[in-house]
């Protein structure tokens, strides 16, 4: 299905002009949205609970308030707290202070789509979801371009929710390179599937299985690390720049031949069948409920998963090897640590 890409010239109405904007949260996405909007000439305040993020927002020159106070002052509110915290923040701080006729935005559809947050009918609901982490949203903006984004007009009480979403995307720099209109359902389900089946869950499981196959056959762990993890970036960068075509043009004929004949032996019809089961769990809300239940119970499952992952042999070997490869550290992780 073809989609339309919109750009700055397509944003005909300055829907944010003269509006008081409140960004809720000052983490990875929060600092980027707030700073980019301010640099685009908009009036931005920060709503965040007292702590490091509160202090950092003030240090960066923003008027900073507790969440409820910021919401009460604002015409347009963007919720950029972590998914698992949004429901309680909404119920305790946002909902009691939300004015009729205001607009409430999100950068991911999790809580709206799965029904954990229900917004009054007299409030606009929109989404702008940059397809990049916050430090890249900020950095690319300062460099004069931006990152692509998805946008949604979900609840159009004022008749201007779509214009607000598009103007927000323009204000943070995303409309410079292109924005695509979608729905909360599509963004949420596709995003979760991509993370789980390919980008995070699928990829780490594939790398770990490859590492174990080599080491169990007697090959050195250090060499296995280079073959299945370290060189991953080289291949992904080529695909990022020019798709499968550029990657295959850049590798040896031996590697390309092996790609064609062996890839389907690894990613079989059975794997695709499992992917469909993963998608079904996402669509039904099962994954969302499992995630929320674990959070409310104090994260026992997530904590156990993290501990097990930390003790993987590939992680221990990789940590030692990277000490001798400072070039693997881009510096972007420092920005992430600051704005968590």
UniProtKB/Swiss-Prot annotation:
Binds 2 magnesium ions per subunit. Residues 3-182 form the KARI N-terminal Rossmann domain. The active site is at residue 108. Pathway: Amino-acid biosynthesis; L-isoleucine biosynthesis; L-isoleucine from 2-oxobutanoate: step 2/4; Amino-acid biosynthesis; L-valine biosynthesis; L-valine from pyruvate: step 2/4. It comes from Lactococcus lactis subsp. lactis (strain IL1403). Mg(2+) 1 binds at residues 191, 195. It catalyses: (2R)-2,3-dihydroxy-3-methylbutanoate + NADP(+) = (2S)-2-acetolactate + NADPH + H(+); (2R,3R)-2,3-dihydroxy-3-methylpentanoate + NADP(+) = (S)-2-ethyl-2-hydroxy-3-oxobutanoate + NADPH + H(+). The gene is ilvC. Changing residue 49 to P: Inversion of cofactor specificity from NADPH to NADH. Strong decrease of the affinity for NADPH and 2.5-fold increase of the affinity for NADH. This is Ketol-acid reductoisomerase (NADP(+)). Residues 183-328 form the KARI C-terminal knotted domain. The lineage of its organism: Bacteria, Bacillati, Bacillota, Bacilli, Lactobacillales.
